[in-house]
């Protein structure tokens, strides 16, 4: 789960990370009075969307008077902001964050992530802050600093000293950096985050370190322990089909293709998407019904797939282990009766109760195209939509 910048800063401040401060606006009629509450010479107006690249897209602007700030804020509120992460459709700006501006002497990058490939927590830092860190890693990899933390032993003093030293901090700034490292680590662990990113972390005109922008991503599986964080969820920033799927206990991610996929198991789902592309088409979604899906969940999964108007065909690929193939078959028939399936439907079943599942489907009035293996299924659905 992602949250907005102003929410991330609120959490980090609770752990002792110094951040820039401001006020959030969620209604246009509140813009003027909110700006009037800020006593500053420079205003920074920031669009609050769950996407990077806001600055280059016009989602972060500076104003040097109250009147200018009010005009900028009114112009920004409600627009569709298009960045390199939103796609061409953009993201509507329903919230803006208005901060007091400050002088910036130097910008840094600092983050903590869960590195699955190394099975450890990793700090990533760079003296090249305020820019896309992926671009820095590609063009100047020597500027990227990494410190791995063993989860068994946790954060140690040498991690904090090492990060401060590699970033070139000395004396009081080194002390500040060590405190920030410790605070960010504690926030990461205690909130079940998967990433905390501060970009940029700056030195202001007083020589102090300050988090000017912040991003936090949380592990959805840990949210049940953090109702205060769950309450920060902004459903307007999420795909409505993905939200609907999550409420039904399904793992669904919308994609750009036109072949809907319903699969059990994340690995099999990815393999299914790969082979669809191999045969010359693109998947419309990732959808994992899970190992314990019942008839109702299967029916809801098909309804969600068909809610995407771009879907021209559906491939159901089930390997019955815990999941029984006859349950899948019953769910398909129930969905067809409820909403009607008017696009080509290819079904590949294998595993528990497979013969019973095939019998249920063959005895139905549905025009189902059976497939005996994954390659056959991909070939048939691609041919069917052409």
Curated annotation (Swiss-Prot):
GO MF, one example: magnesium ion binding
Ligand binding (substrate): 264, 321-323
Start and end residues of each ATP-grasp domain: 9-244
Record's keyword terms, sorted: ATP-binding, Ligase, Magnesium, Metal-binding, Nucleotide-binding, Tricarboxylic acid cycle
Pfam families linked to this entry: ATP-grasp_2 (PF08442), Ligase_CoA (PF00549)
Entry cofactors: Mg(2+)
Pathway info: Carbohydrate metabolism; tricarboxylic acid cycle; succinate from succinyl-CoA (ligase route): step 1/1
InterPro entries: ATP-grasp, ATP-grasp_succ-CoA_synth-type, ATP_grasp_subdomain_1, Succ-CoA_synthase_bsu_CS, SUCC_ACL_C, Succ_CoA_ligase-like_bsu, Succinyl-CoA_synth-like
The record's free-text note on cofactor binding: Binds 1 Mg(2+) ion per subunit.
Catalytic activity: succinate + ATP + CoA = succinyl-CoA + ADP + phosphate; GTP + succinate + CoA = succinyl-CoA + GDP + phosphate
Annotated ATP binding sites: 46, 53-55, 99, 102, 107
GO CC aspect terms: cytosol; succinate-CoA ligase complex
GO annotation, biological process: succinyl-CoA metabolic process; tricarboxylic acid cycle
Function: Succinyl-CoA synthetase functions in the citric acid cycle (TCA), coupling the hydrolysis of succinyl-CoA to the synthesis of either ATP or GTP and thus represents the only step of substrate-level phosphorylation in the TCA. The beta subunit provides nucleotide specificity of the enzyme and binds the substrate succinate, while the binding sites for coenzyme A and phosphate are found in the alpha subunit.
NCBIfam families: PRK00696.1, sucCoAbeta
Family from the record: Belongs to the succinate/malate CoA ligase beta subunit family.
Self-association and partners: Heterotetramer of two alpha and two beta subunits.
Identification of the protein by name: Succinate--CoA ligase [ADP-forming] subunit beta
Species the sequence originates in: Rickettsia prowazekii (strain Madrid E)
């Amino acid at each position: 789960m992602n949250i907005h910048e102003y929410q991330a800063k609120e959490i980090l401040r609770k752990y002792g990370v110094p951040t820039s401060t401001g006020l959030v606006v969620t209604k246009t009629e509140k813009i003027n009075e909110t700006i009037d509450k800020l006593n500053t010479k420079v205003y920074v107006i920031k669009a609050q969307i769950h996407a990077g690249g806001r600055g280059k897209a016009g989602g972060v602007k500076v104003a040097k008077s109250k009147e200018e700030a009010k005009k900028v804020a009114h112009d920004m509120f409600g627009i569709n902001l298009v960045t390199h992460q939103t796609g061409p459709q953009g993201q509507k700006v329903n919230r803006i964050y208005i901060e007091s501006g400050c002088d910036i002497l130097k910008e840094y990058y600092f983050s903590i992530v869960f590195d699955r490939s190394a099975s450890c927590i990793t700090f990533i830092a760079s003296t090249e802050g305020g820019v896309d860190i992926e671009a820095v890693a590609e063009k100047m990899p020597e500027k990227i600093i990494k410190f791995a933390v063993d989860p068994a032993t946790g954060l140690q003093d040498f991690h904090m000293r090492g990060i401060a030293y590699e970033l070139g901090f000395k004396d009081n700034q080194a002390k500040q950096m060590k405190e920030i490292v410790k605070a960010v680590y504690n926030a990461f662990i205690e909130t079940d985050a998967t990433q905390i990113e501060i970009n940029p972390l700056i030195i202001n005109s007083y020589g102090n370190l300050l988090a000017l922008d912040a991003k936090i991503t949380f592990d959805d599986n840990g949210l049940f322990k953090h109702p205060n964080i769950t309450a920060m969820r902004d459903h307007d920033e999420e795909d409505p089909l993905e939200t609907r799927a999550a409420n039904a206990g399904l793992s669904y991610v919308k994609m750009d293709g036109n072949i809907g996929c319903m699969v059990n198991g994340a690995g099999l789902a990815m393999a299914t998407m790969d082979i669809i592309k191999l045969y010359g088409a693109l998947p419309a979604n990732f959808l994992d019904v899970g190992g314990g899906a019942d008839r109702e969940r299967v029916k809801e999964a098909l309804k969600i797939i068909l809610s995407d108007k771009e879907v021209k065909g559906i491939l159901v690929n089930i390997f019955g282990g815990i999941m029984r193939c006859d349950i899948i078959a019953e769910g398909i028939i129930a969905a067809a009766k409820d909403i009607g399936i008017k696009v080509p439907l290819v079904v590949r079943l294998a595993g528990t109760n497979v013969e019973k599942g095939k019998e249920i489907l063959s005895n139905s009035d549905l025009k189902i195209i059976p497939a005996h293996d994954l390659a056959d299924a991909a070939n048939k659905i691609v041919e069917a939509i052409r």
